[in-house]
């Protein structure tokens, strides 16, 4: 006879909220304690939905922090490096993104140089529809939506210049399916050269 497992929805909800609290870094949520110590694009958008269930103001702060990394051309990078960490490679120094990529005169954190699937628009819409609208002004939501629109326009212009309706992915990490076996065959055909030494950090944590 199979064992019967009974899950209390409220208990699971509180456990999930505790994980968000533990991974809160003062305005953004890290996916894991050490393995992923920065703010990841679509992870953060989904975390905002979790925050909204018990702290609407914190949910919107998550979005604000993510958008601090937006480039001048509208691209929203897949990692925003709000602080340094020895536990992750490649870090901001490896990406070495030029200052010219960012709006002039605006303080910003370092970022990676690739993007991720744009789930942010859907998440922001859900935040707005489910929220009480007491922690954010309409004018700020409009500004957030304009930034997201600029990101979508970047996908259209930079990743679909021939207007095919299909967005090009330049790196497996941009797909959100980093370790999918679907990448094995195409990546095997890419010539590789190693011009610098490096040490992976994640293998010591998993």
Please provide the spans of the model-predicted regions.
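Conserved H-X4-D acyltransferase segment
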Residues: 40-54
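Helix-terminus loop motifs that line ligand-binding clefts
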Residues: 56-145, 156-173
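Low-complexity, Ser/Thr/Pro/Gly-enriched N-terminal "stalk/linker" regions
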Residues: 1-39, 60-61, 65, 72-79, ...
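Generic anion/oxyanion-binding catalytic loop in active/binding sites
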Residues: 36, 48, 109
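Short, solvent-exposed loop/helix junctions and linker helices
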Residues: 38-41, 114
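Short amphipathic alpha-helical/adjacent loop interface patches that line ligand
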Residues: 44, 63, 152
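Hydrophobic alpha-helical hairpins/lids featuring a short glycine-rich hinge
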Residues: 148-149
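Extended ligand-binding clefts on enzyme/binding-domain cores
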Residues: 142, 152-206
């Amino acid at each position: 006879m199979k064992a019967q497992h009974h899950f209390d929805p409220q208990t699971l909800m509180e456990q999930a909220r505790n994980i968000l609290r533990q991974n809160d870094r003062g305005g953004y949520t890290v996916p894991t304690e050490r393995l992923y110590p920065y703010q990841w694009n679509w992870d953060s958008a989904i975390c905002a939905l979790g925050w909204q269930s018990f702290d609407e103001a914190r949910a919107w702060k998550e979005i604000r922090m993510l958008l601090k990394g937006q480039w001048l051309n509208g691209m929203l990078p897949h990692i925003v490096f709000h602080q340094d960490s020895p536990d992750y490679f490649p870090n901001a120094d490896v990406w070495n993104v030029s200052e010219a990529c960012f709006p002039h005169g605006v303080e910003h954190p370092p970022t990676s140089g690739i993007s991720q699937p744009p789930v942010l628009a859907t998440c922001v819409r859900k935040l707005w529809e489910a929220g009480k609208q007491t922690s954010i002004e309409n004018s700020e939501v409009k500004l957030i939506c304009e930034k997201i629109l600029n990101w979508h326009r970047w996908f259209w212009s930079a990743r679909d210049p021939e207007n095919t309706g299909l967005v090009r992915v330049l790196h497996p990490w941009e797909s959100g399916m980093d370790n999918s076996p679907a990448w094995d065959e195409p990546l095997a055909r890419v010539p590789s050269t190693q011009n610098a030494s490096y040490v992976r950090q994640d293998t010591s944590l998993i």
